[in-house]
């Protein structure tokens, strides 16, 4: 027997549907993602902490879930909003259906609502705070919870989702034919600051010969330098980058020491802040796997995976920082490089998961910068 569910936005808009997850109440910022596939990766991406994800593609759950496609050890999204869930998933890799997977992990989710209407509302009004409620329904309680949510501006979530202990990562990409993970020869020592790192980012680094040491977000830079890394990686993550003063000061020290540094997503924003720029909260953010980005150095246009609600303000970039990539959707900054240090970053997700890997060569660029520094 299905349970009722509602989504209530802070402006008072109510969507009624049915529960396809756990019963309960969950609050967060409601955003929309335009990817047609990769819902498992989206739900387990730490960058979605405190966000409820609306998937615009109407049929979600077609291929079920498996043990190999998680991007973290737990679900970080605050909730899931979909139009329709197929009754029977179909994939040779499927191990469990969407409702059972969500219920086991305690994720509140709603289906049967007009996601096109919701997406238009979010596009026109911007991301909204909201509340998902399933099981026993109380609209007023849900509305009150939505309006009490403080929003992501000023919220440091990197320290919330980060690992609590240091660990090693040496596992490469999954070879589906062999049903095994690639093991490469490890030539470079990389320290990865975990602000909410995705597993497939670590796999992309390991596949290129990086022996990765993952450290908590607030690890003192002196400890990182004592490891004598060939390079430092600044990971993706959720929330507002500006409150992460511990990360900004650490990155400033890495820049001063000329340590090869590569940042993705939140790591990109933190590198910009460390260089002296500012960031801004976006109205709707970028969430999807079809975003065109131009490489300003070569003019090439690439289709990228994106997941961020904050952006670097290009007008505040200092003279020693050049713009390398720009969004062709809205002109926002997508990449920077320092002219006086071996440090660069990209706003989107070169590892995709889900999405295209047009920007994957940025990992090769990082490896090349470490090789040059060692020579």
Curated annotation (Swiss-Prot):
Residues 1-185 are annotated as: CPSase. It comes from the Bacteria. Its EC number is 6.3.5.5. GO terms for cellular component: carbamoyl-phosphate synthase complex; cytoplasm. The keyword Protein biosynthesis does not apply. It is an enzyme of class 6 (ligase). It catalyses: hydrogencarbonate + L-glutamine + 2 ATP + H2O = carbamoyl phosphate + L-glutamate + 2 ADP + phosphate + 2 H(+). Composed of two chains; the small (or glutamine) chain promotes the hydrolysis of glutamine to ammonia, which is used by the large (or ammonia) chain to synthesize carbamoyl phosphate. Tetramer of heterodimers (alpha,beta)4. This is Carbamoyl phosphate synthase small chain. It comes from Xanthomonas campestris pv. campestris (strain ATCC 33913 / DSM 3586 / NCPPB 528 / LMG 568 / P 25). The lineage of its organism: Bacteria, Pseudomonadati, Pseudomonadota, Gammaproteobacteria, Lysobacterales.
């Amino acid at each position: 027997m299905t349970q009722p569910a509602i989504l209530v936005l802070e402006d008072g808009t109510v969507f009624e549907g049915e529960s396809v997850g756990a019963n309960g109440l969950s609050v967060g910022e409601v955003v929309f993602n335009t990817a047609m596939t990769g819902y498992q990766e989206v739900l387990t991406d730490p960058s979605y902490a405190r966000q409820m994800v609306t998937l615009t593609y109407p049929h979600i759950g077609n291929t079920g879930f498996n043990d190999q496609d998680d991007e973290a050890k737990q679900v970080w999204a605050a909730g899931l909003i979909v139009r329709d869930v197929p009754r029977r998933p179909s994939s040779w890799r499927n191990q469990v259906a969407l409702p059972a997977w969500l219920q086991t992990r305690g994720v509140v989710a709603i289906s049967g609502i007009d996601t096109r209407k919701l997406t238009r509302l979010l596009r026109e009004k911007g991301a909204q705070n909201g509340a998902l409620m399933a099981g026993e329904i109380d609209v007023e309680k849900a509305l009150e919870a939505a309006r009490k949510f403080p929003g992501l501006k000023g919220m440091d979530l990197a320290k919330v989702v980060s690992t609590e202990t240091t660990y090693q990562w040496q596992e490469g990409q999954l070879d589906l034919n062999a049903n095994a993970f690639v093991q490469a020869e490890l030539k470079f020592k990389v320290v990865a600051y975990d602000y909410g790192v995705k597993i497939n980012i670590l796999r992309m680094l390991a596949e290129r010969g990086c022996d990765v040491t993952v450290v908590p977000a607030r690890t003192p830079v002196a400890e990182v330098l004592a490891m004598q890394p060939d390079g430092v990686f600044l990971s993706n993550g959720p929330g507002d980058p500006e409150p992460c003063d511990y990360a900004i000061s650490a990155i400033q020290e890495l820049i001063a020491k000329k340590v090869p540094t590569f940042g993705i997503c939140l790591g990109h924003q933190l590198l910009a802040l460390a260089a002296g720029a500012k960031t801004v909260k976006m109205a709707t953010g970028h969430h999807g796997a079809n975003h065109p980005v131009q490489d300003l150095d070569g003019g090439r246009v690439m289709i990228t995976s994106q997941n961020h609600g904050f952006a670097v303000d290009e007008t505040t970039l200092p003279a020693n920082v050049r713009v390398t990539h720009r969004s062709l959707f809205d002109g926002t900054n997508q990449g920077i490089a320092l002219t006086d240090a071996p440090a660069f970053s990209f706003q989107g997700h070169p590892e995709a998961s889900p999405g295209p890997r047009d920007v994957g060569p940025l990992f090769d660029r990082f490896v090349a910068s470490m090789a040059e520094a060692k020579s």
